[in-house]
């Protein structure tokens, strides 16, 4: 039972890539081929002796092709257990011939609904019924039936047939059957997600049902710690199709670890805030920025970012918003950096940076999606939310103090605000002249975050006088604002919304500090 010779095949594909060569090869093995609609026409035009499925069903295709393979003669031929005397007797009594191979792919539902001008009628017509039914029947009976959904598998099936006198092995049939059930699950999920989306009346809430398809893209040696198993999975949910290879290309270095991918995601997310801006460099460690700067050149921006914290960048991650030039590469090379992310690398830079074999070099291929769903596992389920893609403009800022911020302060405030969104809460970011000069991350108390930011600035002798401060959430008391003023800050940006806002504003006015509210909180847990 391990090997099963293929005598009769059913081919019906919407993606006709490679189907002619595959069918010709099957014919060379003496396989009898049946087909439907456009596939049948294409096979006959290529000189292949294919027959209509109607010769099996003795029933014409009807209702614009909606009904053609949903027939006992088809599914009996697929589902009959070979070697089962009752099944074989019933098949003979009903003139049902066994079908040994099915090559089917489905109507392009996902591609159809992704079109901006798709109509509901078009979407419905691209819901495949007969295809999934045949695939599931064949996959259920994979001990006897070879089922192919992917043109990439044609060649391996043919090679196995050549090696086994026209037969396939049970191991291969099981492998192909697993692909079928993964495909049909994803296909049904895409239909469900689409129907949820178009019937949703309240856009402020997420759908009641959400189907997510995950496909392993990277095997990892371990997870966050060596005792944890891990892998990276590409994700398909609705129109959101996310995979590492879609957005990034690893050009050099060892395989990426679990922690590497977390850091790449964090660093790329922050540098995306500065797409199209002046040369900007972000240095990350453990998913937090330890230094960010913008300047006239990438090299200057890197050196300013590095000066924020001269210890944390060792073994860190660097992301830039411009093609990486040699001057910046040489500056980066002064210490060990584990990962460098850039949209491009200028001539000679890759070869220069590749001299350190343990360094990972990553090319970012395109912009990250501005709207996407984010998922977070908990001990009892999955949290889902929209991506925090909101930013602030000068026009949206509300000045709440007597003193207006200067133009230079406004630039620094907006710069710091973009950064604090990407720092673990509670977050305080000091910035001056488009450079972070102190970052306080992840503290339970906002005042403690401010103290850490001040202490870090002092460690590297960075001047906080006339700096600006960004806070990811409101100051619950005036003490956070007072701490910033005592450090030398001249302007503050924060969401506002505390019941003690007036106390905080009064404290700012007493110290001649300009303060603006954004009306948006940026917690990051």
From Swiss-Prot:
Reaction it catalyzes: (6R)-10-formyltetrahydrofolate + 5-amino-1-(5-phospho-beta-D-ribosyl)imidazole-4-carboxamide = 5-formamido-1-(5-phospho-D-ribosyl)imidazole-4-carboxamide + (6S)-5,6,7,8-tetrahydrofolate; IMP + H2O = 5-formamido-1-(5-phospho-D-ribosyl)imidazole-4-carboxamide
Keywords attached to this entry: Hydrolase, Multifunctional enzyme, Purine biosynthesis, Transferase
Domain of life the protein comes from: Bacteria
Pfam families registered for this protein in UniProt: AICARFT_IMPCHas (PF01808), MGS (PF02142)
MGS-like domain mapped to chain residues: 1-149
Alphabetized SUPFAM superfamilies for the sequence: Cytidine deaminase-like, Methylglyoxal synthase-like
Disulphide bonds in the chain: none
Gene Ontology biological-process annotations: 'de novo' IMP biosynthetic process
EC number(s) on file: 2.1.2.3, 3.5.4.10
One MF annotation (Gene Ontology) recorded for this entry: phosphoribosylaminoimidazolecarboxamide formyltransferase activity
One annotated Gene Ontology cellular component of this protein: cytosol
Pathway(s) per entry: Purine metabolism; IMP biosynthesis via de novo pathway; 5-formamido-1-(5-phospho-D-ribosyl)imidazole-4-carboxamide from 5-amino-1-(5-phospho-D-ribosyl)imidazole-4-carboxamide (10-formyl THF route): step 1/1; Purine metabolism; IMP biosynthesis via de novo pathway; IMP from 5-formamido-1-(5-phospho-D-ribosyl)imidazole-4-carboxamide: step 1/1
Family as reported in the entry's similarity comment: Belongs to the PurH family.
Domain notes: The IMP cyclohydrolase activity resides in the N-terminal region.
The protein's name in its UniProt record: Bifunctional purine biosynthesis protein PurH
Species per Swiss-Prot/TrEMBL record: Chloroherpeton thalassium (strain ATCC 35110 / GB-78)
